[in-house]
Amino acid sequence: MPIGADLVLHEQANPTAIVIDGQALGKVVEETARRYGTPLAFAHMDLQLEKAVLLEILGIPVTDIPLYHFSGDPGAEAVTRVREALGKPLNPALQAHIDSVAYIAQKTDLVPIGMTIGPFSLMTKLLKDPITPIYLAGSGMTADDDPDVALVDRALELSLLIVLHSVAAQIRAGAKAIFMAEPAANIVYVSPKQIEAGSDIFERYPIGADRRVKALLQQHGVDLIFHCCGELNDYMVRQFCTLEPVILSLGSSRKLWEDARIVPKDIVLFGNLPSKHFYSDAVITRAQVEQLACELFHRMAEAGHPFILGSECDVLNVPDSTAVIRDKVDAFVRCQCDGSRVVQA
């Protein structure tokens, strides 16, 4: 099963108009689920959406938003400004995103799955260099000690505010689960050496913020589907499991049959075919996709862990490569895995 709404969206004549039209976007989500034979209707993934909404509220020109980063702590007044703005009519794209969830809930027999970026990953998009201050925080420095640590803390506070608002709105729209993509919670942004030395930085920053989202979901009886396609170690995977997701989606760098040893069996593993590379036959061919799908299918069967064969992340459209990508998605969705192509260890 792919997370493929973006691919289907860009098959349409007017994708830019669709993403601000909730019913039209909902129909794209519905078409995606029905095409790939799944009852799970995953909302469109746009990991720039919440950043755009947040910075628009703070008065950043629309044309500057994609490359914009805070140069310093915007202060407590920024938090107040965002909180007040979220009580007013929403950004058209965010409203359409929420309305697409409502369309699935009200107009179809599919299971509506909401979508959000994780607060930690959103924070990293707001800073030019998030790695250094995260490291400083992991070494014990606080916002009072260093202005860059103060900036990380403020950016995370703002990120959590917008994510919680989006998730709450999607819950009201009828979402039965929320897919939270937290790709930056990985060994690039958080030092494994600091963790090994006893730092609680991973728990304090990504996991601590994610627990706030999880608490909101629990309050409303909504499930968490957690995704991270970044480079991870086993400690990080175990920490993700403490969030008690019903599904854990990991990137292609992980061997899911090995992760099955550390992930509780009440958490379904999802993935993790390298869909980021489907755009190029020079990187991966259709035949290789089929082989990887068969190998993963059979290794997971041997592991005896609940599993959904899927893409490692959402399958993004790449201009001029749409047909190639779609062909590889079809290859693993419709692959008849008989075990003959399983690679022997």
Predicted regions and their residues:
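Active-site loop segments of alpha/beta catalytic cores
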Residues: M1-L7, P15, A93-A345
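Glycine-rich loop at the start of a catalytic domain that most often binds anionic cofactors/ligands
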Residues: E11, Q48-T63
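A gly/proline- and charged-residue-enriched helix-loop-helix capping module
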Residues: T63-Q106
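A short acidic, glycine/proline-enriched capping/turn motif at secondary-structure boundaries
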Residues: L47-E50, P119-S121
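Catalytic domains of carbohydrate-active enzymes, especially glycoside hydrolases
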Residues: L25-L47, A168-A177, Q239-V246
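Solvent-exposed, flexible loop/coil residues
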Residues: G22-Q23, P74, H277
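Active-site-flanking structural segment that lines cofactor/substrate pockets
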Residues: G4-G37
